[in-house]
Amino acid sequence: YTVCLDQKYDELDIEFSFAPQHFRSEDVTPELKQYLLDYCKKEYGIEDCTPEEWEDAVYHGMKTEIHTMATLNDTFIGNIHRQLTTRHMHFTATEATEGCIPQPDIEGVLKVTILVFSVLLNNTEYQLTVRAR
């Protein structure tokens, strides 16, 4: 996503959220369960496992993983890859969120890149909000 900031700002907050991160019980249909069992057997050589092992892998081990990266005027200013479904990249002249660099001049062209590593479900909802003041 690219936005041209219309003036110089003192503070910038980039918020990204998505859901769900993990499968919910209502997401796992009999067809999906069979697909996952067949896939794990074929790709990873995993044979039959106990129902408890399968549930732990599906409901806790598998996850949607989406990170965010930002540049300002084609210069890297931050990257967030925390295991949270809502995260902020916050910038001022003297402070910034961990993984980000303080920005004394918040102006110009802001680019936010959504880095998708894994998405469990089609139509995963997400929201990107940019606030400047």
Regions found by a protein language model. Name each.
Residues 1-133:
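Acidic, Ser/Thr/Pro
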